[in-house]
Amino acid sequence: MPASSPGHMGGSVREPALSVALWLSWGAVLGAVTCAVALLIQQTELQSLRREVSRLQRSGGPSQKQGERPWQSLWEQSPDVLEAWKDGAKSRRRRAVLTQKHKKKHSVLHLVPVNITSKADSDVTEVMWQPVLRRGRGLEAQGDIVRVWDTGIYLLYSQVLFHDVTFTMGQVVSREGQGRRETLFRCIRSMPSDPDRAYNSCYSAGVFHLHQGDIITVKIPRANAKLSLSPHGTFLGFVKL
């Protein structure tokens, strides 16, 4: 078999290489054209969207006509839903107003003792009070009495810490007003005979309808009663409900 010449073998090798190069070139050109077309399409769509947004901004909305309220179409489509929404909004506003009024009506007064006075002729010891917590103007402490300025339902609480060897001690909380005097509540405690152990507290509480002008007093039905003047041992308080 005759041997091939060197020139013929070189031409055969160069022809496939040239074909590959041509295919790669055409592929690159085709890819570039495709990218350019895609960019043109995207640019066209973007310009179209910008024109649409500009038109909507000038017209005020996609379907809003001149003089038409924004909620009109929704009202026409689902009036029951909007009616329920309006009712809920009104209910929330009413609750907010009632809450504000309710908060304004609250009065609080907490009193602690500053001194005691004893009336030997009536066998009574009275406590002189001072406020340590006060909110509102419905109540006012005046010496040994508390005056009610605002009619309403009140939580009333009272405690006296005794240090006395008298066999029984207690407190009486009374109201005077509208031409009569009445006892709201009373508390009685037995006392130890040993002076070192003669401590006992008397606590009472209740809910009462107090009227403007009522006078509230706390009395210990013993002359020269011995009791604690500490704010955590003896106190008197009112909370309007």
Curated annotation (Swiss-Prot):
Q: What main location does UniProt list?
A: secreted
**In which domain of life is the source organism classified?**
Eukaryota
Which ranges carry the THD domain? 107-241
Q: Where is this site: Cleavage?
A: R95, A96
The post-translation modification note in this UniProt entry reads: The soluble form derives from the membrane form by proteolytic processing.
Its subcellular locations are: Secreted
Q: Which organism is it from?
A: Mus musculus (Mouse)
Cystine residue pairs: C187-C202
Signal peptide range in chain numbering: none
Keywords on record: Cleavage on pair of basic residues, Cytokine, Disulfide bond, Glycoprotein, Immunity, Secreted
GO terms (molecular function) for this protein are: cytokine activity; tumor necrosis factor receptor binding
Q: Which SUPFAM superfamilies match?
A: TNF-like
Question: Propeptide residues, per UniProt?
Answer: 1-95
**Quaternary context:** Homotrimer.
Sequence similarity = Belongs to the tumor necrosis factor family.
| Name of the protein in question | Tumor necrosis factor ligand superfamily member 13
* Residues with attached carbohydrate: N115
Which InterPro entries does the UniProt entry name for this protein?
A: TNF_CS, TNF_dom, TNF_Ligand_Superfamily, Tumour_necrosis_fac-like_dom
Per the entry, what this protein does is: Cytokine that binds to TNFRSF13B/TACI and to TNFRSF17/BCMA. Plays a role in the regulation of tumor cell growth. May be involved in monocyte/macrophage-mediated immunological processes.
GO annotation, biological process: germinal center formation; immunoglobulin mediated immune response; positive regulation of cell population proliferation; positive regulation of germinal center formation; positive regulation of isotype switching to IgA isotypes; regulation of immune response
Misc. comment = Transgenic mice develop lymphoid tumors that originate from expansion of the peritoneal B-1 B-cell population. Aging transgenic mice develop progressive hyperplasia in mesenteric lymph nodes and Peyer patches, disorganization of affected lymphoid tissues, mucosal and capsular infiltration, and eventual tumor cell infiltration into non-lymphoid tissues such as kidney and liver.
